[in-house]
Design a protein with these regions (language model features):
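Compact, charge-rich alpha-helical regulatory domains located at protein termini
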Residues: 1-26, 30-39
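Buried hydrophobic packing segments
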Residues: 116-119, 123, 139-146, 278, ...
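Conserved PLP-enzyme active-site core in the AAT-like
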Residues: 107, 137-304, 373, 388, ...
Length: 442
């Protein structure tokens, strides 16, 4: 047999087999049924030199089309300061795990503590955990948290204006955890509070989940939502785009019990749907029900400041069925990413990026409406994302955008496009998109 793709030599393989008390590789694979074993030669290319491999992948990379992004729907093209990937690429940071021996990992615990502090401030909440996988799983975990925090409940309400991808993840959790998911209808693209109140009156609701801005880009008015939930012993849970909270009213200001969402908008580049980081914050009252790691600050026996994994009995040193969650890792590296991003940008920088995104989106919206080719899908305020109806062929228009190097929005139904704008988009790029739309109709 030819072992040219194995790092071990034939002699080394024979030595390892002998040590294991075997005579051949067939003995090693004896547990694998004969009918599914591969026989014959592998269809692999001949070995290449480093320069040949680099040339091959350069040619493959040239096939990629780089587009100017005006699409969002949960993943946004924000700018990443060069220092961020430079720092997180250090070997000390390249892990997604929080440490098991906290006392010897003070640096890691320190940056997680800073992340928690920043997210708690950004959301206006008391406590943050060390991160979740992404915004969808954070929302689903919040639903379970609501069920664990309330009595005689078996249902979680979600606004129909929540991102469908988030809704699907919550439904998956619900199927295996045995709780019900019910939708609150929309009224002109926003949560229908009257329907929510009517359902709360029937009882059995552990929590209500809304999104801000919602999937349509609308900035909703949640006045009275928390009061309605609390009057019926239910939790009020707000899912938000993290970057937008630099300017918007925070979940804490809306009276939320739990704030969740995706941190991708805090400078994490888009790459085939990831990586990302989910955040989860809550009130101090609910802290012991919150899943995931929590890093705390204390002093050692010499009076020196130290960081520790606190309240571990909630989710690790406990029987599985009693744990707050069975998630045993997190997105520590991406939590570090957004921590460095917010540190480098500073409060004013994060606010400025959000303001530029808001201004750019409203400039694009007004320019599209002015063409006479587009009309508003909803008559409601929006932040940096909005839905407009197009009075032509949406598919053809999107193809024209792509031909001109633009990813022009997300098609949400037969005649509607949803556009998103971030601080990366220039006036020239926005004007180019509008002009392409005009030319398409000529």
């Amino acid at each position: 047999m030819n072992f040219k793709f194995f790092p071990q030599t034939k002699e080394e393989i024979e030595q390892m087999l002998k040590q294991a008390g075997m005579n051949s590789l067939d003995d090693l694979y004896a547990d694998v049924p004969e009918q599914i074993r591969f026989r014959g030669e592998y269809d692999l290319p001949e070995p290449m030199s480093e320069t040949e491999i680099r040339s091959l992948f350069d040619k493959l990379g040239e096939k990629n089309r780089r587009l100017t992004v005006f699409a969002g729907a949960g993943c946004y093209d924000h700018y990443t300061p060069a220092v961020v990937p430079n720092i997180i690429s250090r070997s000390e940071f390249l892990t997604s795990y929080t440490p098991y021996q906290a006392e010897i990992s003070q640096g890691t615990l320190h940056y997680i503590f800073e992340y928690q502090s920043m997210m708690a401030e950004l959301t206006g909440m008391d406590v943050s955990n060390a991160s979740m996988y992404d915004g969808s799983t954070a929302t689903a975990e919040a639903a379970i948290m609501a069920l664990a925090s309330t009595k005689k409940t078996d249902t979680v309400l979600l606004s129909a204006s929540v991102d469908p991808k988030v809704l699907n993840v919550v439904k998956t959790y619900a199927h295996f955890h045995g709780f019900n998911v019910e939708l609150i209808a929309e009224n002109d693209g926003a949560t229908d509070k009257e329907q929510m109140d009517a359902r709360l009156e029937k009882g059995g609701v552990a929590g209500v989940i809304v999104q801000q801005p919602n999937y349509h880009g609308i900035v909703e008015d949640f006045s009275g939502f928390a009061d309605s939930c609390h009057a019926h012993k239910s939790l009020f849970i707000v899912n938000s785009v993290a970057a937008d909270l630099a300017l918007l009213k925070t979940p804490g200001e809306w009276g939320a019990d739990v704030a969740v969402g995706d941190g991708q908008s805090l400078g994490i580049p888009m790459a085939f749907g990831g990586p990302s980081v989910g955040y989860m914050c809550c009130t101090e009252k609910l802290m012991r029900k919150m899943p995931g790691r929590i890093v705390g600050k204390t002093v050692d026996n010499r009076g020196q400041r130290v960081f520790v994994l606190t309240l571990q009995a909630r989710e690790q040193h406990i029987r599985r069925q009693k744990a707050t969650s069975n998630i045993c890792s997190n997105e520590s590296l991406m939590a570090l990413f957004v921590t460095i991003y917010m540190s480098v940008m500073g409060k004013e920088g994060v606010k400025e990026a959000a303001q530029m995104s808001y201004d750019g989106a409203h400039y694009l919206h007004d320019a599209l409406i002015a063409t006479g080719l587009f009309s508003d899908k909803y008559e409601r305020p929006f932040f940096n994302e909005f839905c407009v109806k197009y009075n032509g062929d949406v598919d053809r228009l999107q193809q024209r955008f792509i031909e001109n190097g633009i990813l022009g929005g997300v098609k949400v139904d037969a005649d509607t496009l949803m556009f998103a704008v971030t601080e990366k988009r220039t006036k020239e790029e926005i004007d180019k998109l509008v002009n392409i739309a005009k030319e398409e109709k000529l």
